[in-house]
């Protein structure tokens, strides 16, 4: 690991609640930035159970403050050296490199990424809270879709719903984290249903006017005069 030590406290777990899920997107840009910048600085540990599944093995090792310097392929595996001069031979390597949320670095959307609004376009943090990683996040609409940087230039980008880690900065950790992903999926479905309905409003308006299936058929009651009555029940 590049880190010098394993983080031990999951700060966001400590404040996890339905209020956070519902309330985070409603916070100001300043507060959302402050929350996630603080969490980035504190760093997030691996789950305890996952860590124990590795450490219980005699050949499970944790190396801190070191990165891979060179990798060479051989017939039956790989040879790599670290920045501390260690040489290791392995069958394979799994690289946990994290996420890159910058639209300009995503091949699928790179051709039109210049017109996708990012956090750096909407918010400038105060001194000491700068974070290039946070600044590169897309700035989303409430339905997980992109926003245009220059409105009207590529309006179709707002029809791309990005339900993944890229939505974290704008809408919270609801698209890839176990405690809230079900909330996020339901949220996305509601937002898309609302959007489809509003786009088809002329059709629904016509259907409203054309609907003529009676709820009552006329034989469910008999018209009558209202009898005189008093509060003691006598009539």
Where are these regions (language model features)?
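Flavin (primarily FAD) cofactor-binding/catalytic cores of flavoenzymes
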Residues: 2-235
């Amino acid at each position: 690991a590049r880190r010098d030590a394993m983080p031990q406290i999951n700060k966001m777990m400590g404040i996890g609640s339905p209020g956070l899920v519902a309330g985070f997107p409603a916070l100001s840009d300043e507060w959302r930035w402050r929350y996630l910048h603080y969490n980035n600085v504190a760093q997030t540990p691996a789950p305890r159970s996952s860590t124990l599944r590795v450490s219980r093995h005699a050949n499970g090792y944790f190396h801190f403050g070191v990165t891979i310097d060179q990798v060479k392929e051989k017939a039956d595996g790989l040879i790599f050296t670290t920045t501390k001069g260690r040489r290791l031979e392995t069958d394979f390597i799994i690289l946990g490199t994290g996420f890159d949320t910058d639209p300009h670095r995503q091949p699928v959307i790179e051709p039109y990424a210049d017109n996708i609004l990012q956090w750096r376009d909407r918010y400038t943090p105060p001194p000491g809270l700068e974070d290039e990683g946070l600044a590169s996040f897309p700035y989303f609409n409430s339905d997980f879709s992109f926003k245009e940087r220059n409105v009207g230039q590529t309006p179709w980008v707002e029809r791309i719903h990005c339900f993944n880690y890229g939505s974290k900065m704008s809408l919270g950790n609801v698209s890839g984290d176990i405690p809230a992903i079900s909330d996020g999926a339901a949220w996305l479905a509601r937002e898309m249903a609302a959007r489809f309905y509003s786009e088809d409003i002329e059709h629904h308006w016509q259907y409203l006017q054309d609907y003529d299936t009676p709820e009552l058929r006329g034989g469910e009651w008999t018209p009558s005069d209202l009898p005189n009555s008093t509060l003691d029940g006598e009539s």
